[in-house]
Amino acid sequence: MPGREYPPAGRPTADPPVPNQGAGADGEQFLDVRTRRTRALLREAVLRLASQGPVEDIAVADLVRAARINRTTFYKHADSPAAVLEQVLYADLDRGRAELLADATAAELPVREIWERAAGVMVDHLERYDPLYTAGLVGRRSAVLHHLLVDHFTASVHALFDRDPGLLPNGEGQDAWRADAYSRFVAHGEAGLVEAWLSLPAPRDPRLFISAATSALPAWLVTRS
C-alpha cells in the first residue's frame, strides 16, 4: 500500500537499487550498463554481509571490497552500507504493497482481508531475506532493520486511511496528526510481531505470523467511525 503522502522519517531519498529482477525493474532500464552492474554488485555484497551480522557492523571498506568496486564509485550510489540495504529492502516491500493495494482496490476487499494478505506478503519478504533479518533482528541487534519495518507498516496503515478515510478514529487533533499517530501505533506493534516470529526456531510457521498480525489489528481499523 503506497502511502506516499506520508513519507516515513529517515527513509532513503536516493534513487534506490532494487532486488535483481531484470533491467526493466523500477526504472533501471533507463540506467547505463555500468550503473546497473555496480548496483547489482552492491546488492549482492550487502545482502551477503548483512546475512552474517547486523548491517551496522559493516564498514564501507568491507562492502566495497566484497562488491569489487572503489570508494569513489560507492559514494555515487549511497552514503553507507545501511543505506544500500535499506534501498534494496524498501524496493521489495514497496513493490509488494503496491501490487497488493491494486488487487485489493479492484476487488473492494475489507480491511481485515487486506491485512491478512499483506501479512502473507510480509512473510514472503521475510523468508526471501531470512538470513539477514535473523542476523539483525533476533536479539534486537539491528536498529536499522527495526526502523525499516516500522516505516513500512506506518506507510501501510496510512495507505488504508487514504483508501477509506472513515477508518480514522474520531478524537482530538487534526486528521493528519491522528492519521500519523495511529499509523505509528499499529506499526510498532506489527514490527514487534515480526521480531517475535523471527525469534522462533526454524522452520517457522507462516500461518502463525499471519494469524497474529491479523488478530492484533485494533477494532477501530477494521470498522468505520
Model-derived segments and their meaning:
Residues P2-A23, H158-G166, A179-D180, A187, ...:
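C-terminal peripheral helix-coil segments that are non-catalytic and often amphipathic
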Residues R37-R48, Q52, A66, A83-D103, ...:
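Alpha-helical structural segments
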Residues L49-A83:
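Helix-turn-helix
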Residues I58-A59, T134-G136:
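Short, hydrophobic secondary-structure boundary micro-motifs
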Residues L101-P131:
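Hydrophobic alpha-helical connector segments
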